Amino acid sequence: MARRETPEINAGSMADIAFLLLIFFLVTTTMNVDSGISKKLSEKPPPDYKPPIIKEKNIFEVNINRNNDLLVEGDIMGIKEIKEAAIKFIDNGGGLGKPGEDGTPGLPCDYCEGERSESSSDHPNKAIISVQSDRLTEYGTYLMVQDELLRAYSELRNRLSLIKYNIPFVELEESYKDDKQNEALKKKVEDIKISYPQIISDAEPTN
């Protein structure tokens, strides 16, 4: 009686199938990516650091409660209204800027186009935006508020860059990123950033 041989399994074909399954998994699987805002954290101050006295008019308060309602400078406000309110505050130019590092007195903002109200911010380099949320505030709402505030700075920087250098700041910054050795571009980017420094402070969340 003839012996019946057991058929062999084609290992090569199984490897091909496993590879195809892996490719299928990679193509059809989605990965959750956390959204957020890129921020440079402030350095820890020295033990003997004394915080400067800040006038109340130089602080723009944004409060987000647990129901995701916004209270901006004491008034109820919608998210889409924040940008214009922030621009009005930052660009007010109602007084003098910070003194220079060499002790020279601060100067008025000659490029500001605001109302120059004595009850609002003195200068863009003194204008602080304080954002305080509740521990139950939705993160999505917090991000939308931050985005509107960043858009306010972006609009002011673009405007000034167009006036001084005939190019929007976003394009100026991109040009510098492509040519880091260009000192002229570097000075222009720094000039606009110093003129409208992005000062957003996150206050401790309320309970």
Residue positions per predicted region:
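Short terminal targeting/anchoring segments
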Residues: M1-L41
